Design a protein with these regions (language model features):
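Short, well-structured N-terminal submotif of metal-dependent ribonuclease cores
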Residues: 1-37, 50-65, 69, 107, ...
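Generic structural signal for small/hydrophobic residues in well-ordered secondary structure
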Residues: 7-8, 45, 85, 104
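A broad detector of the eukaryotic-type serine/threonine protein kinase catalytic domain
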Residues: 29, 47-50, 87-90
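Active-site neighborhoods of divalent-metal-dependent phosphate/nucleic-acid chemistry enzymes
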Residues: 56-61, 68-116, 128
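Active-site regions of enzymes building and remodeling cell-envelope glycoconjugates
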Residues: 122-128
């Protein structure tokens, strides 16, 4: 299975947050799964870390380095992803989350998320 990690899950993984569920850890460690992160997540971290470093305790460069060292592969933002965001149901207004859902759908992945608004997108998402 191909898994795309939601931004908050990726940050929790990096900082060893107790919010990270056992189910999530087991899923991400499963050898049968390929794990990916989105370039959109780096952009989101860069913007939010600059504005609220107390809420986003890591910089985009740290996230990218962590992913590279852990073998988590990057998914670039492509034209098809942007178009898919326009087709999504208007469940959630956050543009970063909508992009991640779109990437998961277009690229045949499952988005790993703890965000209730994202989980509402159904089959494209694995709730953790």
């Amino acid at each position: 299975m191909r898994l795309l990690i939601d931004t908050h899950v990726l940050i929790w993984l990096m900082v060893g947050s107790p919010k990270l569920t056992k189910r999530c850890i087991k899923l991400l460690r499963d050898e049968g799964c390929e794990v990916f992160f989105s370039a959109a997540s780096l952009w989101e971290v860069a913007l939010k870390h600059e504005r609220k470093p107390d809420k986003i305790p890591v910089a985009a460069e740290q996230v990218e380095r962590y992913c590279r060292e852990c073998g988590i592969r990057q998914v670039p933002v492509r034209f098809e992803h942007a178009l898919k965001t326009c087709e999504l149901e208007k469940i959630h207004a956050d543009p970063f989350d909508r992009m991640l859902v779109s990437q998961a759908l277009v690229d045949g992945m499952k988005l790993v998320s703890h965000d209730e608004d994202v989980i509402a997108y159904g089959d494209a998402v694995i709730a953790v």
